[in-house]
Amino acid sequence: MWPLRFNNRFIDVLPCDPEVSLRSRQVLEAWSRVAPTPVPMPCLLAYSSEVAAILNFDAEELVTPRFVEVFSGNALYTGMQPYAVNYGGHQFGQWVGQLGDGRVITLGELLGADGVYYELQLKGAGPTPYSRGADGRAVLRSSIREFLCSEAMHHLGIPTTRALSLIATGDTVIRDMLYDGHPAPEPSAIVCRVAPSFIRFGTFELPASRGDIDLLRRLVEFTIIRDYPHLHGAGETLYADWFAEICTRTAELVAHWMRVGFVHGVMNTDNMSILGLTIDYGPYGWIDNNDLDWTPNVTDVQSRRYRFGAQPQVAYWNLGCLARALAPLFSDAASLQAGLERFRATYLAAERRDAAAKLGFAACFDEDLELFDALRTCMHQAEMDMTLTFLGLADWEPNMPDSLSLWAEAFYDPVKRDAQAPMLRDWLQRYAARLSVDPLPVAERHERMRLANPRYVLRNYLTQQAIECAEQGDLTELHALLEVMRRPYDFQLGREAYAMRRPEWARSRIGCSMLSCSS
């Protein structure tokens, strides 16, 4: 492993805030120099061995005091030059101006074993000029959620930032979890998150909003050179190709979310990755009973802007915001509009691909989308678990004597189950008729469905149980969840409990059904 060689291309190329202080302020440059604030008693709670291997960390190094000191913000490896990035964003549809890394500090870039440079960030490492008066810390509950979900999403095959380590600080912070006037102390923690780039849509929106076209252009050209080196050309042609690829990646990302039932919860433009990664895990969730209007974010319960079924439309809207920010670099809007159309075409193609895979078809035709939507309607009206519905369908055969037995574990309400049984049986008859003309062999169909329909997803109630145990010093569930989520598509003997539907006690419990942005 040693010596680690850190790169700092972002700060080497882009302009720096001349003021070196933690004073909250408007910053006109791309980044500010800032060091992590030390913590009193750092303790390693968990790490990802896969991410560590990519970054060339030896297994022995991960449990050394030096590693814990560095990734708690108490020390630096040689070559690290910590900084916070400046950006803005649209939040819940409104432009809010400068935001920036309010509690995230980038340590630098490290060349991975796969030949890719990765940025390493500490989330919860203390205040920065962008903290807006906050303490820059993160609570243990939100840190566990980000750590686990980063790794779970990766193993589901969904583009995402990763997590190297989760470290308790030994300190507490005051948070009002539900924003209801009841602040309380909570343990704090720090996550080291890892990605090739943490640049987001809001990185470009901020200078554009200020009319700083020079900085906007410099940011665009830096991002293309570093993060899109396969693109060639110059000027508007290059910029157009770049924007089109961002649209493509974003469409693929959201299609993956919809495939597994993931709800991001806070799709603000400052939470949209320029690489098409899932980024900034806050009040996310997986839909249990199939409700397209469900949002896990308690802040969003009135408008439901970021509800499950709206995610493709929100992604398109966010790309429109990015297009408007980039418009000063183009002579007309045609290239940007072409990129937005690329999003639509890519998403529709991905939706068809995923519907075919989830239903076990060789290809997806228009009538198959109707069949897919009809199943979603059935799931909603019968209050069926999305994950378990598709999992059961993967084991179904038309000659089964009791056609609904495959879904015995998927129903949340027996009354609704009985009421909708005729509709479900009718749907299965239509499905059987479609299978009879599909060219896929039975074994290939089952395997195709197995790879598209996860058995294990990071349900909020599972995460909440791990959080409550960890707050009492018991890390057993945290480590068990991390292990289970490494193989989400496989049957795991002895881990059946992690594949069960949400228990009734978790239906309306805070942390299990609804979450806030408090972290």
From Swiss-Prot:
Residues annotated for ATP binding in this entry: G100, G102, R103, K123, D135, G136, R193, R200, D280
Magnesium is among the record's keywords: yes
InterPro entries found in the cross-reference section: SelO
Binding site for Mg(2+): N271, D280
This protein's record includes keyword Zinc-finger: no
Keywords for this protein: ATP-binding, Magnesium, Manganese, Metal-binding, Nucleotide-binding, Nucleotidyltransferase, Transferase
UniProt-annotated catalytic positions: D270 (proton acceptor)
Protein name: Protein nucleotidyltransferase YdiU
